[in-house]
Design a protein with these regions (language model features):
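Flexible hinge/capping segments at coil-to-helix
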Residues: 155-193
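Hydrophobic hinge/microswitch elements
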Residues: 127-131, 136-140, 146, 201-256
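A short LG(V/I)-centered, amphipathic sequence patch enriched
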Residues: 40-59
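Central regulatory/effector-binding core of bacterial HTH transcription factors
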Residues: 89-152, 222-223
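Beta-alpha-beta core module
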Residues: 152-159, 164, 227-277
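Short helix-boundary/capping micro-motifs
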Residues: 12-28
Length: 295
């Protein structure tokens, strides 16, 4: 079986037109016809039904089933090409979400600098959901990811390296700031919220907390910028729901624990594709990031 034939096959399933496939790959139509014939003979089945009188091509049920396998093969081949190309380079494609990158990752920089790895990092800055997709596509060597639960995907090699609570955030002179021992989410929901947008896992945590408390808090503003969110909260434009990992002493904010039974946590995990063979530099980066000594 020729790998190119799989590409022809998948394109034919997509277009249902031999001439179009030939044009897409700049080959002759008989080349496409013979490739499909060889595949059908190899598997002893018919993948396409040809209605020559109406010039129609129909994909059989076995043809559709085979195409599912073909798509996975093509996807893995493309991932392998990306990973092998990067293996020849010294740089490490490293996913880093905004909050983790700004308030958690810097504690590792002395060790990375000493190991000569800091200048090898090619940082990709996106939310954890986007970075997870890039990992799956083989476009990242590894990443630090935020989540509400530990990752369980078989396709992912993941290790929880830290956790931080998600709390109600208010200005220092806000009425809720007096409740140092904490507030319920229902109590906090009496005030308008400023939240992070759906790129952050905080949006999911917010919805879960509201559902458990059986309340519908008013959201007056959503943002993708943590600094803007904190400034608006400090300016009494609303309160927020944020990991205290993202707070600084000079923010003028107070983090209040939730008194509800279930309190969400911001879980930080180190992750790579399960079948990804890390380069020596990427493996050294992994070892540093997973070592408690460097927290």
């Amino acid at each position: 079986m020729n790998i190119k034939e799989l590409y022809y096959y998948h394109d034919l399933v997509r277009t249902k037109n031999f001439s179009q496939v030939a044009s897409d790959f700049n080959i002759s139509q008989p080349t496409v016809t013979m490739a499909i014939k060889r595949l059908e003979e190899s598997f002893g089945t018919t993948f396409f039904m040809r209605d020559r009188s109406h010039h129609q091509l129909t994909v059989t049920s076995t043809g559709l089933q085979f195409d599912q396998h073909v798509q996975r093969i093509i996807e893995e081949l493309e991932i392998a090409q990306k990973e092998l190309a990067r293996a020849k380079q010294e740089c490490i494609s490293f996913g880093l979400p905004p909050i983790i990158g700004s308030w958690y990752f810097p504690r590792f920089t002395p060790a990375l600098l000493q190991a000569g790895l800091l200048n090898q990092l090619e940082v990709v800055d996106h939310g954890s959901a986007s970075l997870l997709q890039l990992l799956a596509k083989g476009e990242l060597d590894l990443a630090l990811l935020g989540s509400l639960q530990p990752f369980q995907q078989p396709s992912l090699r993941a290790r929880v390296i830290d956790k931080a609570p998600i709390r109600i955030i208010v200005a220092k002179d806000h009425p809720l700031a007096a409740f140092e021992d904490g507030v319920s989410f229902a109590q906090a929901a009496q005030y308008p919220f400023i939240t992070l947008d759906d790129e952050y896992i905080h949006a999911q945590a917010f919805c879960q907390a509201a559902h458990l408390a059986r309340v519908r808090p008013k959201i007056v503003f959503k943002t993708s910028d943590v600094q803007i969110l904190k400034a608006l909260v400090a300016n009494h434009s609303g309160i927020s729901f944020l990991t205290d990992l993202a707070l600084d002493d000079n923010d003028g904010l107070v983090a209040l624990p939730l008194t509800d039974g279930s309190q969400p946590e911001f879980i930080i995990s180190l992750a790579a594709r399960a079948n990804r063979l890390l380069t020596p530099n990427a493996q050294r980066l992994w070892s540093i990031l997973e070592t408690p000594l460097y927290k």
